[in-house]
C-alpha cells in the first residue's frame, strides 16, 4: 500500500470510530445502555486501529482486545480506559458472558462511564496520530 492508501484507510477507521461514539450517545438517550456500551468499545477499537495504521503503515491485526491493541500503539496513557471498555465487547451482547441479560444489566451510570472512557481514548488517538 502506498502512503496515500494508508492514510485513506486510517481515516476510514477513524471516521467510523467517531460515528460509533455518536451512535453510543444516541443509544443512551433512548435507554439502550448495553448497545451504547458495545458501541463505546467499537469506537475505541476503531480509533486504535486507525492509529495503528498511521504508526505502522500497515493494516491492523484482527481482534477485539483493546489492551493488546493499545499496547501495540503504546497507549499506556489510556490503559485504564482500555481496561474499562475491554469487557463490553462480549458482556454487552451475550447473556452467557454477562451471566444475566445484557439489556437489563446496564444502567445509564455504567454506560456514561463507558462514553467517558471512549472519549478519552479518542482524544488521545487524535492527539497522538494527528487525526482530524
Question: Predicted segment positions?
Answer:
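Terminal alpha-helical segments
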Residues: 1-132
